Amino acid sequence: MSDMNDKKTGADKNAPAMTGAKAAQENGSVSITLPSAAGAAPTQVSLAKALAAAQQHHAMREFDDAKLIYQLILDVAPDHADAIFYMGAALHQTGDTAQGVELMKRATQLNPRAVALNHNLGMVYEAIGDMPAAIACYRQVIANDRGGHWHCTLAKQLTDAGQLDDAIEFAREALTLLPPHARGIAHNQLANALTLKGELAEAIANFQIAISLDVENAMVNSNYVLTLNYQSQPNLAAIFQEHKKFGDKFESFVPRMYVNPLLAKARADANADPARRLRIGYVSPDFNDHAVGKFIEPVLAAHDTTKFEVFCYYNKNRVDDATKRMQAAAAHWRMTSDMFDGDLATTIQNDSIDILVDLSGHTGLNRLLVFARKPAPIQVTWIGYPNTTGLSTMDYRITDAFADPVGATENLHTEKLARMPECFSCFKPPSNAPEVKALPALARGHITFGSFNNFAKITPEVMRVWIAILARVPGSRLVLKNWCLDNDRMKTFMLQAFAQCGATPGQIELWNPNTSNFDHLNCYNSIDIGLDPFPYNGTTTTCDALWMGVPVITLAGVSHVGRVGVSQMSNLGLQELIAKDTNDYVDKAAALANVQRLATLRGGLRERVRTSPLMDAPRFTKNLEAAYHNMWNAYLSTQKS
């Protein structure tokens, strides 16, 4: 049974008891009599003051009191848009989202020019996953307020929805509307959309401008270093230095909790038993049906609870079936998205966490500034990001000898590399995945290659190599599919980009995204061979393809970001799918385009994956727990000296 953080979720038990209300008409204006504590004189106030009182209760999460006053206002002013809206918000916050959204929507219809109401409704739609409705609200906001900052909000939502060209247009418009000193966030939003579109040089330039305008914005700095990983010809030493700059900059801004040697010694002396039950804390916004969730969920379920007490610090309000499964597997569950970095760090320290594990790196909604404060004696980064965090306070990065060969990448990390004996992660396939069907080439008469990765990974060099493969395999096709292809503008852009790299009409097929994971996976039943991008490999996309019987050709890079495929194929015993350079990549893809060979490989691939280290959660978790014990023992030895 998971324990929940003790954040107040209902009316304060010590709030005054409600005794009654009435409406009065005074000098042509409506007033109401507010309920009061028992024995106290009732207070007659204007509707504006009543609304303010209700909102004060609302802000304190005293929802019952707030709703009572909202209703009193509506009893005498049934079309009071603010009271309707905030009554809906309170209903949403207390579990009645359907009714709450209806009320909030009605309020915006009554007052369509209310910027705050439309913006807040957009945020609610965003939280419940209705992105089209959220975007419609943000567009209405811009129709009423063209100050520029709302354009940035809309650009972000359009980017998240894959409407990249629209996002770019609104971000560029924001740059014309905002004063120069306030344009940092617009440059950041523009860069994010450009990154996902694959226009990396312009994206990096805009990130650099954004940082110059907003030096201490950690999110912008994280977005920048993340995007550096996508470059076609990366300078790994320079990329490491940019990550290290992040660490140096933001560690200098925050108080570090474990720099006090007396505190560290007291903690070690009190917990010096190397065999005791360790407290492990996982920090992530992805404890849900997200790519990272597919790798952490099997570990949470397999942890030895007699030796490890697991805390999950969840940095998002979204709750789905995967969230519920992970929450059930954890001993303690903390909802942290509303917590400031310092408050979360204090919570973690008060929980006496021994080993704190970051599952985000520099990806969205990370809490690296919590790790910069060093709230736990041992801090580790794992699975969410294929590079160093740049933090000196991050002690270890979990990897394996395939993704980070011994001696090859230590100089590119601020962390010590903790290598798993087999693979660095363990994947949980969806329980409702479709069955693997017969090789599509048997019915179609031609080979279909495919990649379902995001376009930031598909650089012009990748396009040229993939087109060379199509030239080697007569009649073959290449299918691209991802969440940004739900609009004709993006399809036209990608077809033109491939044409500029030598593709001929009909060679490239662009498929729309699917609304269900089952339908998404079923698309692999139309793919014969998967192609892994480089130098930034796929991870979840490769696991999905393999689970659906689709072998994936990968190119061995120099560092982790380009060697994930090496780890995956090596752990499957499919080293013949690992290319040493681009020419070898083309050769291996062409050689694999043999119908008989493919049909045989496809027929046994799911079982091969199922029985491999990639999906053996108990085996992987045992290795991970051994690594945690090694880290703890090493820490204890340093405290004794």
Predicted regions located by residue number:
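Alpha-helical solenoid repeat scaffolds of the TPR/TPR-like class and their adjacent stem/linker regions
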Residues: M1-H446, R464, T492, Q496-P505, ...
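Thr-Gly-centered strand-to-loop micro-motif
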Residues: D82, D358, F452, K481, ...
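Short hydrophobic "strand-cap" motifs at the C-terminus of beta-strands
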Residues: V283, F452-N453, K481, W511
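A conserved nucleotide-sugar
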Residues: K307-E309, I467-Q496, Q500
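Nucleotide-sugar-dependent
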Residues: T363, D532-T541, L555-R563
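Short alpha-helix at the nucleotide-sugar/activated-sugar donor binding site of glycosyltransferases
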Residues: L546-W547, S570
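Short acidic/histidine- and often glycine-rich active-site loop of Leloir-type glycosyltransferases
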Residues: G562-G573
